[in-house]
Amino acid sequence: MGKVIGIDLGTTNSCVAVMEGTQPKVIENAEGARTTPSIVAFTDEGERLVGQPAKRQAVTNPSRTFFAIKRLIGRTYDDPMTQKDKGLVPYHIVRAGNGDAWVEADGKQFSPSQISAFTLQKMKETAESYLGQPVTQAVITVPAYFNDAQRQATKDAGKIAGLEVLRIINEPTAAALAYGLDKKKSGVIAVYDLGGGTFDVSILEIGDGVFEVKSTNGDTFLGGEDFDNRIVEYLAAEFKREQGIDLTRDKLALQRLKEAAEKAKIELSSATQTEINLPYITADASGPKHLALKLSRAKFESLVDDLIQRTIEPCRKALKDAGVAASEIDEVVLVGGMTRMPKIQDVVKTFFGKEPHKGVNPDEVVAIGAAVQAGVLQGDVKDVLLLDVTPLSLGIETLGGVFTRLIDRNTTIPTKKSQVFSTAEDNQNAVTIRVFQGEREMAADNKLLGQFDLVGIPPAPRGVPQIEVTFDIDANGIVNVTAKDKATGKEHQIRIQASGGLSDTEIQRMVQEAEANAAEDKKRRELVEVKNQGESLVHATEKSVKEYGDKVSESDRAGISTAIDALRQALAGEDVETIKARTTDLMQASMKLGEAMYAAQAGGGEAASAGAEDPQAKKDDVIDADFQEVDDKDHKKRA
């Protein structure tokens, strides 16, 4: 069995870790960073960029650069949060055939699961490069407050990326695992997790290797992106006030504002003031316009105060559901990049009445916890038991549109619960089971997860047939529902697939596309590598001709010149094999030059002339000299 990796698929950044013996290790990506921006872009040439390369070109390619895609995963196009997001991002959000929110670039539509899969592929490749072996299995984290559709969509993303997702684990729970792994502590901890796009709070009880989640709460549309947007709105408003130009209508300017906002936000965690300078942000008839202003920490805090306060109510609810007071919390663990903001730390300290624990890296702790869970599933980590909960109540719609709960929120999972219902009308031969998730009393106000029909019920007066509805939630928090007519034994079971969501056929198509893209990416990479190699050889050869050209014959110089021209011509094209062949030709042609060069270095100008007359003899001389040098070194070592 290969290694199982742990992946934190974040809104802003993603991170991958693996267990090495009993210790988790965060793996650096190809760029040498421990986290990877969750950004995917498509260039003019159709090339796909993931991570830092995608982020670098975002300003010049805003409509084809997808960021914060996690906010759309598992959401419908008509969802109020999707509509809110539409006004905040420069790329196109479109309605898919199934009613889900998808994104579009150059006329091609992508599901959020597919875009997330590209980031997961990058994480997979990062792990494979480090481990030196293929990786096919992973534990992936999601916000604790993700509903069933969002969890299923995350699992689909893993599948598209070529990963078997062994477990979907809640981010605060993963953080608690990482926090508590080496500690022999026991007690009640609160995990306050404010990331790039989502907020979660979980109350856990830890003791003797058992991590039991008592309650969880949160907001799946509250995070660093919202803090960035407040700065963007402020900058745009100030610029409009001074210059009379609305920058929000210009996608290029908007992307520059977004980058500047993120940078300013980060700087204000350590500095009390930052300067934002964006020259040539736009232009009008009078000429180019520049944006330059100072932003103080106090001003930033006033811009986002309501966002920070929005995290307090979920904390209050989580404590109430867990049946503990703030004073009974032994430790508050901060997770997510936003918790570096001093004001957030102050608010958390005030609410819980204690200094929050800052001993974990907020950007890496979730991936580390995922790796620990991967180690548990693989059998490498012993004596750790994780008991998580379902974040939202589950139930069905009953007469009058009422939401009848079968499983209450914060129930430990996996769990199974049954309840008997009956028909609403005489001689009713079929019932429609509509499954909802949420906390509102009327079904329509909650999230519809899916529906199915149980048919073939024998005619009977209303209230007589007995229909047993069973909810089964697995350890990933994904729901199965069964309806059974107790009189006939007739049964209908579904794994909840939202009215939207990806079908197996669509997932399979996306898997194949991902594989095809991987092959295409490999070809592109090979082309870039052989071109780089060819260009380096041309440069080195031309330099050598200038220095040592007089040491070789006229015909050799002509041969080298012809080979350089042929390689240059090949480099202008896209044919890998032709470039390789012309590179080899130039290497062969320039061998005489190389011999002359070594001869000149080893024996001076006279020897080099001899080398030009008798290259083979000189080659031998060079080799002898080479061995002589080594012998000298050895002799020195012995002495």
Swiss-Prot record:
Biased composition (Low complexity): 601-613
Keyword presence, Phosphoprotein: yes
Modified residues (Phosphothreonine): T198
Gene Ontology MF terms: ATP binding; ATP-dependent protein folding chaperone; unfolded protein binding
One family name in Pfam for this protein: HSP70
InterPro entries: ATPase_NBD, Chaperone_DnaK, Heat_shock_70_CS, HSP70_C_sf, HSP70_peptide-bd_sf, Hsp_70_fam
Signal peptide: none
Function: Acts as a chaperone.
Name of the protein this chain belongs to: Chaperone protein DnaK
Organism field: Methylobacterium sp. (strain 4-46)
GN (gene name): dnaK
